[in-house]
Amino acid sequence: MARSVWKGPFVELSLLRKAEDAQEASSNKPIKTWSRRSTILPQFVGLTFNVYNGHKFIPVSVSEEMVGHKLGEFAPTRTFPGHAADKKGKR
């Protein structure tokens, strides 16, 4: 179920402050965050976030198409090794 419109998008307050500081300083330094649940806002466009996936930090460069999505959507937590090969076909 989607979040109520009257509540607005959720963004971690500390992440919002860091993003505003980075915009003012116009620095290219990535913002390190553990907040995968935060929604990407229009003022985040052009910034780079290092999003933690439970193992390491994944760099996420925010573009206009990402606005409205969550940061965690762009840092996968599971690796898919692929389906097992058909053993009969290799003979």
Curated annotation (Swiss-Prot):
Keywords for this protein: Ribonucleoprotein, Ribosomal protein, RNA-binding, rRNA-binding
Position of the signal peptide: none
This protein's GO CC annotations: cytoplasm; small ribosomal subunit
Gene Ontology MF, one: structural constituent of ribosome
InterPro entries: Ribosomal_uS19, Ribosomal_uS19_bac-type, Ribosomal_uS19_CS, Ribosomal_uS19_SF
Encoding gene (name): rpsS
Family to which the UniProt record says this protein belongs: Belongs to the universal ribosomal protein uS19 family.
Keyword check for Ribosomal protein: yes
TM annotation in the entry: none
Keyword Ribonucleoprotein: yes
The organism of origin for this protein: Erythrobacter litoralis (strain HTCC2594)
Parts forming coiled coils: none
SUPFAM superfamilies the UniProt entry points to: Ribosomal protein S19
Pfam families per UniProt: Ribosomal_S19
Listed name of the protein: Small ribosomal subunit protein uS19
Function description: Protein S19 forms a complex with S13 that binds strongly to the 16S ribosomal RNA.
PANTHER family in the cross-refs: RIBOSOMAL PROTEIN S19P FAMILY MEMBER (PTHR11880), SMALL RIBOSOMAL SUBUNIT PROTEIN US19M (PTHR11880:SF8)
GO biological process, any: translation
Lineage: superkingdom: Bacteria
